[in-house]
Amino acid sequence: MKIDLNADLGEGCVSDVELLTLVSSANIACGFHAGDAQTMQACVREAIKNGVAIGAHPSYPDRENFGRSAMQLPPETVFAQTLYQIGALAAIARAQGGVMCHVKPHGMLYNQAAKEAQLADAIARAVYACDPALILVGLAGSELIRAGERYGLVTREEVFADRGYQADGSLVPRSQPGALIENEEQALAQTLEMVQHGRVKSITGEWATVTAQTVCLHGDGEHALAFARRLRATFAEKGIVVAA
C-alpha cells in the first residue's frame, strides 16, 4: 500500500526544513495568506534537495486572517488570483531546476471549494490553464475533486490526521468544538482507519466513507515534528510506503 504525505509550508513555521525530510509532498504558500518570493524560493530549494514533490498552496487574498476568512468573490476573480499564484510558484520552481507537480488550495478557499461548485470550477480551470498535467488536491469526496475530474485533471483526495470530521465527510469548522484532534493516539488511529479502511468516525459517532490518497500533516502544531516522525514509523510498521 502507498500513501502520499503532505504538509503546508512557507507559512512562517520554524519546522519547515525538518518536515521536508518526513513528507513526500510540499504545499508552498504563494504570498496571498503567507510567504513571499523569498520564502517560496527557499521552500522550493529545500524540497528539491529532499526529493519532495513541489506544490502550490494558493489562497484568498487574506494575510490578516491567514486565509481563513470566508469570501464571496466572482469566479473570474478566483480564477485570476489562483492562476497568478500557481504561475509564480511554477516559475520559481523552473528557475531552480524543479517542476511543480500539484496544487492544493489553502484555508477557507479550500473549505468553500469543497462545497461550492462554481468556486471549485474556477480553481480547477486555473490549474488546467496553467498546466493540464498538474495534480489537483482537494478534500476527499468534495466538489473540488469533481471539478478537477471534469477538466480531465489527475486528482488526489485528501484526508487530515488531526482534524475532526462531520457525518457527511466534511471537516468540522475550526470555530466549533472537535475541530482539532489534540490527542496523538487518536490522530494516529484515525489516520490508519482512513488509509487502511477508507472510513472515518465523525464527532457524532457515525462512520463516513473517505478515499485517502494523501494525508495532510499540519506543521504549525506544538508537537508537529514528533507526530510526523511517529506517523512515518507507524506507516513503516504497517508496510505502508510514503511516496508522492
Curated annotation (Swiss-Prot):
Its EC number is 3.5.2.9. It catalyses: 5-oxo-L-proline + ATP + 2 H2O = L-glutamate + ADP + phosphate + H(+). Pfam families: LamB_YcsF (PF03746). Keywords: ATP-binding, Hydrolase, Nucleotide-binding. It is an enzyme of class 3 (hydrolase). Gene3D superfamilies: Glycoside hydrolase/deacetylase. One of its GO terms (biological process) is carbohydrate metabolic process. One of its GO terms (molecular function) is ATP binding. It comes from the Bacteria. InterPro entries: Glyco_hydro/deAcase_b/a-brl (IPR011330), LamB/YcsF/PxpA-like (IPR005501). Forms a complex composed of PxpA, PxpB and PxpC. Belongs to the LamB/PxpA family. Catalyzes the cleavage of 5-oxoproline to form L-glutamate coupled to the hydrolysis of ATP to ADP and inorganic phosphate. PANTHER family: 5-OXOPROLINASE SUBUNIT A, UNCHARACTERIZED PROTEIN YBGL-RELATED. NCBIfam families: PRK05406.1-1, PRK05406.1-3, PRK05406.1-4, PRK05406.1-5. This is 5-oxoprolinase subunit A. It comes from Escherichia coli O7:K1 (strain IAI39 / ExPEC).
